[in-house]
């Protein structure tokens, strides 16, 4: 399965380059060019770049898809849909999903609420130096600790009682309490088991800023 890096418009102070393909969204394409990385696909309405910058992007990109400014999807959502149409088995890591406009950041965090993207949630990851976000659908899952990360939080999008086992702070039917996000939990000696009754859970692994 191809590994794809998707660069979007938030903060890009940290990223990795061990990918098969690089996709840029709107102005993030310029960042790829600055870094000397290829642009296998450029996607967006490109309303945040000048005409000369767009021409530079079009010249460098192997493929460029320009979308209308008025549309139902964000540029990032559109890019993901195109990626999974081309590569249904792809694993996508998104860089630049955090920072910048809060509405953009929240749209990125809740990307898999889109019915077209929900089937691919296990293959989408949001990443920066301090945070890693992954998604788990309804069912029982083992969550592995990301090397270097200290804390783990769970945000359940759905009804019913989320169950967390094998963590420093377990959540079961015996001690269940409802919160939007169960934050600042920790791994102990191995994976954490999470049981999602319906919907999906957002798993956020983090560490303090050094």
Identify what each model region corresponds to:
Residues 65-87:
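Short phosphate-binding loop-to-helix
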Residues 91-140:
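Anionic-ligand-binding alpha/beta catalytic cores of soluble enzymes and soluble regulatory domains
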Residues 1-57:
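N-terminal beta-strand-loop-alpha-helix module at the start
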Residues 129-131, 136-210:
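Long, charged alpha-helical interface segments
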Residues 60-68, 121-125, 147-155:
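A glycine-rich helix N-cap at a beta->alpha junction
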Residues 29-31, 49-51, 73, 101, ...:
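Short gly/pro/ser/thr-enriched loop/turn and capping motifs at secondary-structure boundaries
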